[in-house]
């Protein structure tokens, strides 16, 4: 009986553990060859001339290697995307047009955006939901950072099995989103969870979350990413769907 009591008193943490029914790998119906990644991000300077059009890339040579868009493209490819469709936007008002153009491209399974804030993330969500309802199955991937409570609030505002919010402690949200998006697109077997996956490419070093913070993030629909011994890895990969109606939803 004492052994049973000890087992009952164990704390169940989300690092790692039993995966929820809304694992992001289970939403994207990818084939054995993977999916293409579509990226929308602000561009300026030398890349401004490419704004407002879809650029198809199989290697990271279309945009400046120092720009956010250039780095996002490189990271998506480095993590397994076989093809990237990139659409540079000049201002916040151009994102809707970017999503419409990108989601009309061939074999897109992941839409990555550097959008931020509640309204920006919800715009991505609405775009991928509309595409999926039109039989163009895809998920959106965006980055979030800041206090754990702020990341949770954004996930709850999005609350969709079609959206993955990549939470870190470091700046460069779009970069982390692109890396995770590439890894998701590369999955040939949708039953394989992405938790614990190492991310390739030049990513900013980010901090480590406590077990309690991981619990709070994952249970609220945030995919936690952190650095350990110089390696950036996905702790748990979930979609932002955490509530159904007014109650929690982990099915």
PLM regions and their residue ranges:
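Short, Lys/Arg-enriched N-terminal segments with co-localized hydrophobic residues
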Residues: 1-6
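A glycine- and small-residue-enriched flexible loop/hinge signal that marks low-structured segments
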Residues: 8-15, 19-30, 34-51, 55-58, ...
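Acidic, aromatic-enriched beta-alpha/helix-loop junctions
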Residues: 58, 62-65
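A broadly used, surface-exposed interaction patch
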Residues: 66-104
């Amino acid at each position: 009986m004492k052994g049973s009591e000890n087992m009952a008193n164990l704390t169940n943490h989300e690092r790692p553990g039993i995966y929820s029914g809304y694992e992001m790998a289970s939403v994207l119906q990818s084939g054995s060859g993977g999916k293409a990644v579509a990226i929308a991000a602000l561009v300026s300077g030398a890349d401004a001339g490419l704004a407002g059009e879809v650029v198809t890339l199989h290697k990271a040579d279309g945009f400046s290697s120092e720009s956010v868009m250039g780095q996002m493209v490189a990271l998506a490819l480095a993590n397994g995307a076989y093809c990237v469709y990139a659409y540079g936007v000049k201002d916040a008002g151009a994102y809707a047009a970017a999503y419409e153009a990108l989601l009309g491209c061939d074999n897109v399974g992941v839409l990555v955006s550097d959008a931020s804030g509640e309204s920006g993330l919800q715009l991505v969500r609405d775009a991928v939901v509309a595409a999926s309802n039109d039989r163009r199955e895809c998920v959106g991937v965006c980055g979030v950072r800041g206090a754990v409570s702020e990341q949770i609030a954004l996930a709850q505002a999005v609350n969709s099995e079609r959206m993955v919010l990549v939470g870190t402690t470091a700046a460069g949200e779009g970069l982390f989103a692109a890396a995770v998006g590439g890894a998701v697109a590369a999955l040939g077997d949708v039953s394989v969870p992405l938790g614990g996956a190492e991310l390739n490419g030049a990513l900013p070093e980010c901090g480590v979350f406590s077990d309690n913070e991981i619990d709070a993030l994952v249970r609220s629909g945030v995919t936690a990413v952190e650095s350990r011994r110089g390696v950036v890895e996905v702790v748990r990969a979930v979609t932002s769907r955490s509530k159904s109606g007014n109650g929690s939803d982990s099915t």
